[in-house]
Curated annotation (Swiss-Prot):
The keyword Iron-sulfur does not apply. InterPro entries: DUF1328. It is found in: Cell membrane. It is a multi-pass membrane protein. Keywords: Cell membrane, Membrane, Transmembrane, Transmembrane helix. It comes from Coxiella burnetii (strain RSA 331 / Henzerling II). GO terms for cellular component: plasma membrane. This is UPF0391 membrane protein COXBURSA331_A2131. Belongs to the UPF0391 family.
């Protein structure tokens, strides 16, 4: 699960870079939303992994 969160987080960061630099100004709002959604999912997954005491499968 952490693997997929990392993948989508990277996609959101790339989308944010395009949105914030003006390359795709129309999608900057979507990029911001995706960035924060996947940041929250990443943190939740990281906390869940630490609580369970398991190592992530990469």
């Amino acid at each position: 699960m952490l693997f997929w969160v990392l993948i989508f987080f990277i996609i959101a960061v790339i989308a944010a870079l395009f949105g914030f630099t003006g390359i795709a100004a129309a999608s900057a709002g979507i990029a911001k939303i995706l960035f924060f959604i996947f940041l929250v999912l990443f943190v939740i997954s990281l906390i869940a992994m630490l609580v369970r005491g398991r190592r992530p499968k990469l």
